């Protein structure tokens, strides 16, 4: 259910998630490389109103693990691997990277429910992160960055969907933008925007006429307690 990119005006979702993330960075062939595993867990409650029966509502709850995500990223231009000493003196500027995010169907899923934490399918996102940095170094307490992420996501089929045989989805194109500013070494905030296009679904070969063309905005507050521990709060 999560990660489809589809906006449904007849669907009301209430989602509470706790997200665990492990990241490992390294240098391969003089390039910065990062490996990340993301595991969400939480609870989802949904209310679906049918367009042809507005007085009928289908309510569903799902709790447990969400789908596991595995992310690989690498520096392609002006993102060299940095030692601790070089990191403190490196001046951020225009830089380009590459990423691949694989989502595995490991989340809680019940074919008898109209909404689930898991999507019961694989997906892969390919993108090219672009960064513009404004500051003396990554440790600049007043560092400002502007990040763009053009990407495309390809989806596998869900062969066990609610009240159907197969659900498929066409590629979803996205452009994410984030303007981030450090207020001091331990607190930062960002304004976030996402434009989505495509991602139309088909149920048993019939189009659901739900191609996306949407723009969403939000804000994020980050608090860093130590080099390895931080808290991030987002609203969208």
Question: Which role does the model predict for each range below?
Answer:
Residues 20-24, 70-76, 100, 126-132, ...:
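Residues on the lipid-exposed face of transmembrane beta-strands in outer-membrane beta-barrel proteins
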Residues 39-45, 76, 102-108, 132-134, ...:
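Transmembrane beta-strands of outer-membrane beta-barrel pores
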Residues 158-236:
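Outer membrane beta-barrel transmembrane domains
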Residues 12-18, 63-70, 92-94, 118-124, ...:
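Residues that define the transmembrane beta-barrel architecture of outer-membrane proteins
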Residues 64-122:
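Hydrophobic alpha-helical segments and helix pairs
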Residues 1-17, 56-58, 111-116:
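Surface-exposed strand-loop-strand hairpins of Gram-negative outer-membrane beta-barrel proteins
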Residues 25-33, 78-95, 135-144, 186, ...:
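Short loop/turn motifs that connect adjacent beta-strands in outer-membrane beta-barrel proteins
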Residues 33-37, 70, 94-100, 144-150, ...:
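Transmembrane beta-strands of outer-membrane beta-barrel proteins
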């Amino acid at each position: 259910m999560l990660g489809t990119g589809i906006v449904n005006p007849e669907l009301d979702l209430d989602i509470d998630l706790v997200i665990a993330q492990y990241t490992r960075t390294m240098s391969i062939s003089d390039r910065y490389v990062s490996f990340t595993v993301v595991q969400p867990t939480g609870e989802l409650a949904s209310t679906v109103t049918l367009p042809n029966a507005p007085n009928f509502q289908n309510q569903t709850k799902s709790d447990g693990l969400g789908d596991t995500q595995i992310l690989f990223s690498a520096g392609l231009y002006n993102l060299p691997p940095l030692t601790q000493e070089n990191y403190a003196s490196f001046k951020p500027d225009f830089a380009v990277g590459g990423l691949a995010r694989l989502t595995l169907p490991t989340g809680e899923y019940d074919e008898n429910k109209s909404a689930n934490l898991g999507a019961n399918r694989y997906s892969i996102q390919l993108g090219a992160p672009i960064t513009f940095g404004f500051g003396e170094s990554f440790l600049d307490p007043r560092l400002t960055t502007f990040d763009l992420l053009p990407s495309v996501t390809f989806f596998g089929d869900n062969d066990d969907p609610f009240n159907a045989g197969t659900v498929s989805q066409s590629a979803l194109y996205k452009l994410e933008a984030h303007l981030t500013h450090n207020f001091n070494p331990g607190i930062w905030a960002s304004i976030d925007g996402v434009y989505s296009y495509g991602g139309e679904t088909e149920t048993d070969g019939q189009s659901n006429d739900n191609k996306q063309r949407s723009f969403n905005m939000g804000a994020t507050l980050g608090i860093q307690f130590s080099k390895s521990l931080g808290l991030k709060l987002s609203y969208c």
